[in-house]
Amino acid sequence: MNRLKILKENGHLIPVILEVPEEADSVVIMVHGFTSSKECPTGQLLIRRMPEAGMGVVLYDQPGHGEEEAKEDPFRIENCMDSLAAVEKYVQLKWPEKEIFYFASSYGAYLTGLYLERRKHAGTHLLMRSGAVIMPWLFLGAPGSEPDSEALEELNKKGYLMLGLTGTRQVKVPKGMFEDMMLPENDLYGNFGESDHGNTRVAMVHGEKDQVVPVKFAREFAEKYGLPITVFEGQGHSLSDDPTCPDKVADLAIDFFK
C-alpha cells in the first residue's frame, strides 16, 4: 500500500492511498461521503477485498475532508469534481491499460453522478452505495420547507457552518456550497437521466432503514432512471448494522464490476 499527493490546478493537494497490484486489470476509485475520508471503514473494506478479485484500489480525501491537506481545499461541488478528475487522470496516466470503476458512497455517489453528467470521464461502472440522491434537501431542507433562521443568521455572519452527521467529525461547509445546492443543474434527482452518462453503467445499493436518505427516494430514483438497485433489509445508512453486510456489499460490487 502506497501513499502520495496529487497536485490540483488550484494549488491544493489531494492525499491518496493506493493498492494496485501489477496484475490487476482494473482500478476502483472510491469517492467517500460527507464527513468521511479515505481512511474510512469502507476504504479498508475495498483494500481488503478488491485486490484479491483482480482490482486495484485508489482512496482519496475530498475537499474539506480528512486530516491532511485536502481539508484546506474549500468544500464546493466544482472543487470536488476537480479532485475526482485529478485522481482519475493520475490513474489513466499511471495505468493506461486498466479499466476504471467508481465506488461512491452517500454524498460521494451524488457528486459522482453529477460528474458523469458534466465531465469527460473514463469510468465504465459506478456503484452508488447509500447514494444521497436528494443531497440538496439534506443541506437546504425539503422543497417548500422553511430555512432554519438561526443557522441562516450564523451562515450569513460567518460565511460557513460546521456540520456533521451524528457520531462523525464536523466539516466546514462554506456559504458557497449552499449556493451550489440551490442551482438546478445540481439537482441529481431531477436531472440524472438527461444524458447516457458517457456509457457508464450505474447500479445502486441501499439500506432499507437508511435514516439519512430514506430508501423511498433511492427506489424512486432507481425506477425513474432505470437503474438496478439492491436493498439490504434492516440496514441503515452505513450498511453495517449487520457485521456481515459490508462484505455482502463488496461481493455485489465485485460482481457488478466484473
What are these regions (language model features)?
Residues 103-112:
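Gly/Ala-rich beta-loop-alpha elbow adjacent to hydrolase catalytic centers
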Residues 25-33:
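Short beta-strand element of the alpha/beta-hydrolase
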Residues 1-21:
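N-terminal cap/lid segment of alpha/beta-hydrolase-fold proteins
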Residues 47-69:
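Conserved alpha/beta-hydrolase
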Residues 65-95:
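Catalytic nucleophile-loop/oxyanion-hole region of alpha/beta-hydrolase
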Residues 35-47, 62, 216:
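The serine-hydrolase catalytic nucleophile loop
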Residues 110, 121-220, 224-231, 236-257:
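The alpha/beta-hydrolase serine catalytic core
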